Amino acid sequence: GDGVGILTQIPHKFFARVTKALGMDIGGEREYGVGMFFFPQEELRRNQAKKMFEIIVEKEGMEFLGWREVPTFPNVLGHKAVECMPYIMQGFVKKPVDVEKGLPFDRRLYIARRVFEQSSDDTYVVSLSSRTIVYKGMFLVKQLRTFYPDLQSEDYCSAIALVHSRFSTNTNPSWERAHPNRFIVHNGEIN
């Protein structure tokens, strides 16, 4: 498939549970931001990119809490999608005490993301927010929930869900080009 994804609210109960199992304390709802990352498969380059993000978060006055490997089932994918599949991880960032929840915190996360994007050209930040998260990839709609078992968890709850499937007419499919994007769902023709 050319790509599909889903944008939801951050499922706090789900993340509180899975991060606790990793020994991470993310705090209360909207007290943290979650980044979804497409890293290189090569361990050295991946570790360098992860370290760079951690440094940037600290330089922007926030505390990096830890990484989570996102569970996936690549066996449901086609050969081409598996060949170029990134290493998918989530990074957790603590909200500074002097920054309000919501938009003010998301602005800080936005700046950290933009600085990181300038420093790491082989990593794609799928989303980084204290309010929403995007799960996406180069596959079909029917494969989304199977590929990402997180989405099947009973405690993964959201009041919104924007799903978008991409059929490219003039570009090659890629993991990064799958929709939805970080803030918008569109057909590529904003006039």
Question: What are these model-derived regions, one by one?
Answer:
Residues 2-191:
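N-terminal segments that mediate ammonia production and transfer
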